[in-house]
Amino acid sequence: MPASEQVDLAVEVFRMLSDATRVRLLWVLLDGERPVNELAEAVGKGPAGVSQHLTKLRMARLVRTRRQANQIFYRIDSSHVRQLVEDAIYHAEHSSGGVPEHHRGDAQQLSELRSADR
């Protein structure tokens, strides 16, 4: 059984992931570091609201920042965060039925192989 402090930290991480905008921001950040304006555009929200979400993610140690001139750039904090976000989205894709997005290339290849065998 994990220590109580670790469970509390895990609960905080899940609390941060309970917001769709924050999950979308983390998903965009899987592709690499981005400034606030690009993140806002990518998720279709205003920069002020996105900054508030990013502050929460930073305080939960899910993202890191880097300042360059008058811009703040955000990135995923660690490979653990990256894996958590990917696993959450992949789990959702598997739960919704059909062929998950991350398997569509595999399904296409399998279909082509089956067609070639006929």
What would you call each of these model-derived segments?
Residues D8-A48, I72-H80:
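N-terminal helix-turn-helix DNA-binding core of bacterial DNA-binding proteins
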Residues M1-L9, H80-R118:
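Amphipathic alpha-helical dimerization/coiled-coil segments
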Residues G49-V50, Q68, G105-D106:
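Intrinsic low-complexity/disordered segments
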Residues E33-R34, R58, I89:
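Residue-level detector of secondary-structure transition/capping positions
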Residues K56-L57, R75, G98, A107:
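Alpha-helical and His/Cys-centered functional microenvironments
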Residues R58-Q68, R75:
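Beta-hairpin "wing" of winged helix-turn-helix
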Residues H53:
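Residues within the DNA-recognition helix of helix-turn-helix
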